Amino acid sequence: MRSHYCGHLNKSLVGQTVELCGWVNRRRDLGGLIFIDMRDREGIVQVVVDPDMADVFAVANQLRSEFCIKLTGEVRARPESQVNKEMATGEVELLARSLEIINRSDVLPLDFNQKNSEEQRLKYRYLDLRRPEMSDRIKLRAKASSFVRRFLDTHGFLDIETPVLTKATPEGARDYLVPSRVHKGSFYALPQSPQLFKQLLMMSGFDRYYQIVKCFRDEDLRADRQPEFTQIDIETSFMTAEQVRAVTEKMIREMWLELLNVDLGDFPIMPYSEAMRRFGSDKPDLRNPMELVDVADLLKDVDFKVFSGPANDPKGRVAALCIPGGAALTRKQIDEYTAFVAIYGAKGLAWLKVNDLAAGMEGIQSPVAKFLTEEIIQAIIERTQAQTGDIILFGADSAKVVAEALGALRLKAGKELGITNESAWAPLWVVDFPMFESDDEGNVAAMHHPFTSPLNLSPEQLKANPEEALSNAYDMVLNGYEVGGGSVRIHNAEMQSAVFDILGITPEEQRLKFGFLLDALKFGTPPHAGLAFGLDRLVMLLCGTENIRDVIAFPKTTAAACLMTDAPSLANPAALEELAIAVKLATKDKA
């Protein structure tokens, strides 16, 4: 039906007759001529309809926005005075020779010329995707996927599919369950990742695997999470952690170079402990120059329990965050920051303004200055490298609360005050994570997943001191987002059982849930390691947006609902009966 895309017309085609299919973006009547801006996925071109072409002119008179049309015409150069440098096709226009209305359109429930509500955009997503901004994002996503396949194919990786109907495994979030009609009372789980299957593929001898795969997690959502998401899943045998990082870093660097013409450079490597100490986050945004600075040693003997208490507590921390130019902050703004850190458990936010460094104590403004000697204040200023016009904010609490509160405040202030370089790219690797952490109930949990290998420890050493163990894990971080994470895997049954034991999984549970894995580990399992990237998050960064819904064709809301199809919905009672399922809905307390 078409010979060219609208957005591909240029001066090299002048004089040629082309056939286009697309939509009416806009129609204008000017000086007896009708001008149509015709749009398809590749762009917009201006069409001119001359009244001398009576039949074509009559059809053009009927056109309205979003009519689907087919048009044949001659490409001609625009007069120099009418060249539109804002359009890719701005040097040419199309003189219409024939025009057909394929399908008419009702008035759209969306207005493409103004901002529509998120709810309306999701309800009519098929229309929202017609907008060039959205279309460009989906096309860039396709290019990213294509690049990944080409790169990994070239490097000897095999694209192998793994099951979607599988068994629930503990990976940190709730599973989406699928009832079995044949095995009544039993359920499949949709995979949170292909983790165990890709490890089994390594045991099968496929030493380089990849898959661009849908994964599912029933968890609380936010801007960069969806219940179903796409993962670039990678696993290798006989490669070290350093080699896995090298090949995947190369992939991301070449992707950015091809799609954005940006050279990310070599990725620095930072231990987890350093990231938490300096930035209060295991995914630090290095575009922001501010750092958390420890000052507990200076405050152990001050007559101010807010500082001296945590300073003398082995599990406590007192840290300072110097904000350049922050002395200009109003009391209202400081109060807003105080309320913000309270979200993370902080009980307050002490501050010290350096109004004039040369004026000594006269140039200092702080409600806590009376508790501190001049020597201590000068030592804090020197350590934080504060200058005239800066403000120093303090976090004093448990190490966890201080890191989370000041780490989050660092990001917030960096963005709001223009300190973060939003136009830069700052990648890094974070390595040497703790092997285990405590969950909200105080139970031991794997920081990554229970199949991650410890760093240079035997099973006996791991069991003797699990809280000090580091894992052979690594995360790729870009502009404050974790875009990929992986590890060297456990490749012998003894170590895997030791990890399960530490996690409180009984031998009986181990056999029930992971018997197939423990058995497989006994048959000459090769050392293996891998990594998975969140494709949605990568594309979000490539597109310069802050919400992964912007780069998914048909996303869910933060309530995990599809407004377009009204999913999820109630099931047919007959289908539930066939599955031997009875639905018991919780009733709200009327009291």
Curated annotation (Swiss-Prot):
Gene3D superfamilies: Bira Bifunctional Protein, Domain 2, GAD-like domain, Nucleic acid-binding proteins. SUPFAM superfamilies: Class II aaRS and biotin synthetases, GAD domain-like, Nucleic acid-binding proteins. It holds the Pfam family GAD. GO terms for biological process: aspartyl-tRNA aminoacylation. GO terms for cellular component: cytoplasm. L-aspartate binds at E171, R217, H448, R489. Signal peptide: none annotated. Residues 195-198 are annotated as: Aspartate. ATP binds at R217, D218, E219, Q226, E482, G534, L535, D536, R537. Its EC number is 6.1.1.12. Keywords: Aminoacyl-tRNA synthetase, ATP-binding, Cytoplasm, Ligase, Nucleotide-binding, Protein biosynthesis. The keyword Cytoplasm applies. It is found in: Cytoplasm. It catalyses: tRNA(Asp) + L-aspartate + ATP = L-aspartyl-tRNA(Asp) + AMP + diphosphate. InterPro entries: Aa-tRNA-synt_II, aa-tRNA-synth_II, aa-tRNA-synth_II/BPL/LPL, Asp-tRNA-ligase_1, Asp-tRNA-ligase_1_N, Asp/Asn-tRNA-synth_IIb, AspRS_core, GAD-like_sf. Catalyzes the attachment of L-aspartate to tRNA(Asp) in a two-step reaction: L-aspartate is first activated by ATP to form Asp-AMP and then transferred to the acceptor end of tRNA(Asp). Homodimer. This is Aspartate--tRNA ligase. The gene is aspS.
